[in-house]
UniProtKB/Swiss-Prot annotation:
NAD(+) binds at A169, I170, T249, A250, R251, D275, H298, C299, G300, V301. This is Putative 2-hydroxyacid dehydrogenase C1773.17c. Pfam families: 2-Hacid_dh (PF00389), 2-Hacid_dh_C (PF02826). Its EC number is 1.-.-.-. Belongs to the D-isomer specific 2-hydroxyacid dehydrogenase family. InterPro entries: D-isomer_2-hydroxyacid_DH, D-isomer_2_OHA_DH_cat_dom, D-isomer_DH_CS, D-isomer_DH_CS1, D-isomer_DH_NAD-bd, NAD(P)-bd_dom_sf. PROSITE patterns: D_2_HYDROXYACID_DH_1, D_2_HYDROXYACID_DH_2, D_2_HYDROXYACID_DH_3. Keywords: NAD, Oxidoreductase. GO terms for biological process: generation of precursor metabolites and energy; glyoxylate catabolic process.
Amino acid sequence: MKQSRTKRVLAIGELKFATNTLKRLSEKYHFEFIVPDPHDRSKTIEKIHEAASKSTFDACFWLFRNAAISPFTEEMLGPLLPTCKLFVTGAAGYNNVDVDWATRNGVYVANTPNGPTEGTANMNLMLFMCTLRGAREAEQSLRLGKWRQNLSLTDDPYGKRVGIIGMGAIGKSFAQKILPLGCEIVYHNRNRLEAEEEKRLGASFVSFDELLSSSDVISINCPLTPATHDLISTKEFEKMKDGVYIINTARGAIINEDAFIKAIKSGKVARAGLDVFLNEPTPNKFWLECDKVTIQPHCGVYTNFTVAKTEECVLASIETFLDTGIPTNPVNGPFGMNGC
């Protein structure tokens, strides 16, 4: 009987925590790792092409800290076809992956929506509190030697109506964290949650317009898709309360940047907390200089727990696909075992 070929996986990046799982899977599959160049996308492309020229691969995955080498397109991944039938991204968002190209070629794209949940939701909570309490302004005042000079009274979360746009895993986790703080939680989502889950989260479903017009705090927790690009722009800001607070840990392009900056300058938005920006890793200087905005360098997932869980999710998706032909959490397909 002819012995079957050992299935091969190309890994872009290095695993830090899931070493035991990798050791177990390495008994069934062959893993080849390449280290991406964090400063030069073209060099990473060269490494992938070189690996593809020497061997065939059945699946490919990449991990965190990939902003410098994205997007993941035909230019980068094309040589892995036609044998490679799965790309797994170690993130919940997949807007930097050319899913349409992959779909045309019968290649699954899978994300890891549960891996980043806690880290991102905790970042959301941190920015929520910092924004309400004006932490950036207070810290800057102290660092300049101006002890409490010109500081205004800030807000507590109790009694605030918090509107969550996007009630997926991250939105739900954030809702659970703020419910004990005495917040009134409303949400808008593509699909309404079941009544029991709404009760568990203490969240009420409202229309998009009602969320905009009635919320004291608006939290962006939806994925970036063609439908959510510039979801919040001039007319949406006009519907909001004066002095609203904005939190965004999803993607920068969900909020139109020009309209956002105008809303902050005018006072329509009192303060904001941002972990994501339109242009990464070089955001608009306004965000770096404005005392009314608490900022982070898209690092919500940069915790030991989150990275470890995401690595396990990536490997679980790889194993499921190589064993069954269908990955965990595909965002396209379905395809047959051999693609289209």
